[in-house]
């Protein structure tokens, strides 16, 4: 149930930042999100081996990646605030909404126990990074964004196609073991 709360809280934070026209409010929400992510990682560690929402499990490799992400969240959020100091409030908020989305999607991908769910979250991270690349809205950023989305989406789609072929080769019983 805590995983669902984490996902819903991330959505609420994004909506609140979108509606906020205040830089200090956005900074406060980003600090709160960082603490929430660290708390979620601790919760996941305390519930090792538990499956939530059918498609997410707190296992060793996923927890390791989740903790690394939690360690990186604080300096990334701090740097994002410094990097966007001179940006207008709209760009400042778009950057931080995209950052929350990216961290949330990465967390979901790390703990996913189903290949389709993993693929969905991996593709979602691509879109969140695209928003981070294009938050300045320049011509160079637009070119970089569409190239990034094209290359990543094709690569992720081909990887998922390979997973589907493996599931057809090994049959339905062994397809569950691919997850």
Language-model features and meaning:
Residues 94-101, 105-179:
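Alpha-helical multi-pass transmembrane bundles of energy-transducing inner-membrane proteins
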Residues 1-98:
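Transmembrane helix-loop-helix hairpins at membrane boundaries of multipass inner-membrane proteins
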């Amino acid at each position: 149930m805590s995983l669902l709360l984490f996902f819903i809280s991330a959505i609420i934070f994004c909506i609140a930042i979108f509606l906020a026209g205040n830089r200090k409010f956005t900074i406060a929400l980003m600090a709160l999100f960082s603490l929430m992510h660290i708390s979620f990682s601790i919760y996941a560690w305390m519930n090792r081996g538990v499956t939530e929402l059918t498609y997410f499990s707190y296992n060793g490799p996923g927890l390791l990646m989740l903790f690394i992400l939690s360690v990186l969240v604080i300096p990334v959020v701090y740097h994002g605030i410094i990097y966007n100091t001179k940006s207008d409030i709209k760009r400042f908020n778009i950057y931080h909404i995209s950052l929350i989305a990216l961290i949330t999607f990465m967390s979901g991908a790390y703990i996913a126990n189903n290949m389709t769910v993993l693929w969905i979250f991996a593709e979602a991270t691509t879109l969140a990074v695209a928003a981070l690349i294009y938050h300045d809205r320049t011509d160079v950023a637009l070119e970089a964004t569409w190239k990034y989305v094209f290359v990543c989406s094709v690569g992720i789609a081909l990887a998922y196609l390979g997973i589907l072929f493996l599931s057809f080769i090994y049959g339905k019983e062994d397809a569950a073991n691919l997850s």
